[in-house]
């Protein structure tokens, strides 16, 4: 990979709860006590309505992942929430969806010549990526400025995880869905201009301390 000897080792990738993290030749399902950022590839994230199953797993268990659409994931989540509220409904079972490789890409475009992609990261997170997978201070600035602008917005954001060239946005699924959030973030991204004129807080550290 770009950041290490193993193909799974990339520069940065934020982690959502329920994400499958490929750490070298080992796969790890990240729970709520797992890290929020690291340098390994995360190909899929469990639907929110299925997260309870993670707590039932034991070492050595075999897990089969089945692709679902956002709409199907919402049905599963709603059925689970109804059950929690003693409104028992049958949890829907779906045939595996035949999704294209681009299904998770909610939006893509350019900002002043720099390409960006907004990807699905489970149901309640989106991942905004700027430029190619490489160390680049200009791409870092894009992610930093976007995070600063989102912090000033009134969007229902729970938290954000910045990477080197990316930003994961965790939002309140009860107020906005992933496609709506992606559209809001894209609109703000399009207003990022004149990075050469942007100043960010910094400090000088002299070594040895």
Positions of PLM-derived features:
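Glycine-rich active-site loops that engage anionic ligands at enzyme catalytic sites
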Residues: 1-209
């Amino acid at each position: 990979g770009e950041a290490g000897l193993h193909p799974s080792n990339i520069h940065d990738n934020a982690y959502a709860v329920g994400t499958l993290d490929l750490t070298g030749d080992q796969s790890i399902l990240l729970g709520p006590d797992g890290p929020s950022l690291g340098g390994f590839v995360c190909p899929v994230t469990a639907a929110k309505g299925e997260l309870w199953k993670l707590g039932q797993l034991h070492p050595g268990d075999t897990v089969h992942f089945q692709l679902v659409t956002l709409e199907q994931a919402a049905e599963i989540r709603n059925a689970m929430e109804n059950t929690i509220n003693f409104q028992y409904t049958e949890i829907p079972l779906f045939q595996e969806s035949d999704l294209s490789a681009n299904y998770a890409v909610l939006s893509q475009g350019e900002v002043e010549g720099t390409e960006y992609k907004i990807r699905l990261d489970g149901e309640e997170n989106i991942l905004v990526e700027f430029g190619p997978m490489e160390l680049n201070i200009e791409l870092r600035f894009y992610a930093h400025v976007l995070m600063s602008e989102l912090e000033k917005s009134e969007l229902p954001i729970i938290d954000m995880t910045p990477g080197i060239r990316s930003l994961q946005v965790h939002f309140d699924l009860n107020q906005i869905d992933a496609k709506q959030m992606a559209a809001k973030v894209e609109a703000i991204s399009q207003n990022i201009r004149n990075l050469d004129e942007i100043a960010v807080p910094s400090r000088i550290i002299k070594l040895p301390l």
